[in-house]
Amino acid sequence: MTVHCLGNGKVCVYGRGADIFQAFGPEYSSPDAFTLSVCPEGGVNEPAATVKHSRVCFSHTLGSLKMLDLVPPGSSDFYRAVTGNVRFRLTLKNAPVLDLLSPGTAMAVTEPGAIVYATSFENGRPHGYTSNRFRYILIKTDGDVVLRKTSDTELEIAVSGRGLLSVVFSETPEGLFSERPDPEIGNLMFSYLESPPDASPLKHDPRINPARNLPAAANSPFYKEILDGADVICAQQAETGAVLAGYNYHLSYVRDNYGVFRFFLAAGAYENARRLLAFYMSVFERHGRIQNAQGMSESAFHIHENDRVEITGYLVLMFTAYLRATGDTETVRKALPLIKYCLLSQQTELSTCGTLPFNGDETYIAGGLLPRSAIADGSMEATALFHRAITEALSVPFIKEYLGAGAADLLEAAKALIENRFTANFAGENGLFYCNRPLEDPSEAPLFRPGGVRACGHGFGLSFRNKNGDYVCPACLSLDLPPLFPGLYGKRFAVEAALLSPCFTGSQGLIPEGLTAKAAASVRDSLNSRSRIVGFEYGFLMYGQGFDRGLAELMLAQRDRFGAWSEYYDGGNQAGTLCRPWETAVNLAALIEKYPEE
């Protein structure tokens, strides 16, 4: 079933039909708060017809039963208005239900220690980054509703007529009660729910349908599709500026946010873009580093192999592209320490043959299209990205001045080395161009890694290289484990779709003439026949070959009915995480930026 998302920057809710399976508040990257499901024994056992009204408002119809969900802009509340007879089960995920404060009112307190981001599971229990804050939840019902506590973590909500459920989030008990549900919101929701939506005077009420400011996309023939996709993306943009990577990834992933950032620039949503940059600046100011992913409010990190490469290149390109689009030198000057960190982090990882390794969360590795045995190899994509980042950064006089002559000279030398060796490193026989350059000596791989996937299956974290070259947890290091990737160690891989990544980042000048067009043609021909493709491949292809209407129609046909692309497509069907900002952003940015080339 299609996944949808309501979000206002403070409260984010993911649902399938009328059932809610994740909810976050009073900010994103916080412990999962509750689920809300229709009880089938309550007389309703059919899937809901769900309609999106805006990024903060969805309605559901099940026969004569009508529901409207809303997270009003600027509030820390979630509301569901109901007309009809139905029972719901509300299950709190990280807090017990306190005794009912009064009829129709309950409260829960999530204490410090609740999981924000799980890195592993042992005996069914999650381990990882935990919250260091109290969070308070007020659950209130009004109208023809009976609220009943059925267990330590569950509430039953029985509606027989006209009822309103309100869930209020706060970080303080005082805030919880000072921000009690707004009675006007209930009146607004019932007025909207009980009138034909297209005829309702409330259709354009900013509490139901907040404004969308995408001036650069306004003249696009795909404007409606762009607006739908913008809702998917902006619902998952936190008040802090960063964007979730979807319901399976509750942090801000740099690569995903780079794609989102490109969409913001392409659509002219410069304030959204500036807020995203401000988030990464604030993380760096607090922690002095950027990892593969970071918490949006809590100090949580998803640390992967080789986090000093690839993601650092994306960050540099975000700042230089923003400067070029807006002329906002003030923001970019504030980011100079971060830009320098990103450039020199990559420079220290550059091999003597002019390559950077793979980041452990690189798309084709994460999706299983490249084995994890290749992570320490030279990466065509990361290397080209570093080259582009150097070129862009050194072209801005005040960035070059801040770096200083010594650092600038190091980067110029790195750029020259990459250029001189790039074709030799990645070109092969018969016109093939490879994604990786295997290590000449496997012992060059690091003895341990501070983060990333453990080959032994024991989650993420510190791992050590065993005799097979696989990275395992300390407890498994002395075990006689079989090789995880038999026959794949030291092998070269040619994933043609990966050749299109430099077209997206502007690094295609390093690819030998004609190979990009050849790769694009091959990828285009195989889109319908390959068993698995990544969801942004359509957009990358459009950046590689230019706009064509057939590709645009094929790409748009892969969206779900709310306007989102998924993480992967298996046999043409959505797979992995649905309702994804990154894939949606890349594909829409391509539609905006490449359409004039028709």
Where are the regions that the model predicts?
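Generic long, charged, amphipathic alpha-helical segments
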Residues: 507-536
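Aromatic-rich carbohydrate-recognition surfaces in CAZymes
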Residues: 250-353, 379-387, 552, 578-596
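C-terminal capping/lid segments that line or modulate ligand- or cofactor-binding pockets
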Residues: 1-31, 35, 295, 302-322, ...
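Terminal accessory carbohydrate-recognition/targeting modules of carbohydrate-active enzymes
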Residues: 1-218, 255-256, 265-267, 596-598
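Active-site acid/base region of carbohydrate-active enzymes
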Residues: 211, 215-229, 280, 285-287, ...
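Catalytic cores of carbohydrate-active enzymes
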Residues: 290-293, 355-358, 375-380, 384-505, ...
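Well-ordered alpha-helical scaffold segments within catalytic/enzyme domains
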Residues: 209-217, 258-270, 314-331, 385-402, ...
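Asp/Glu-centered strand-loop micro-motifs enriched in Gly/Pro and often flanked by an aromatic residue
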Residues: 214-217, 228-252, 262
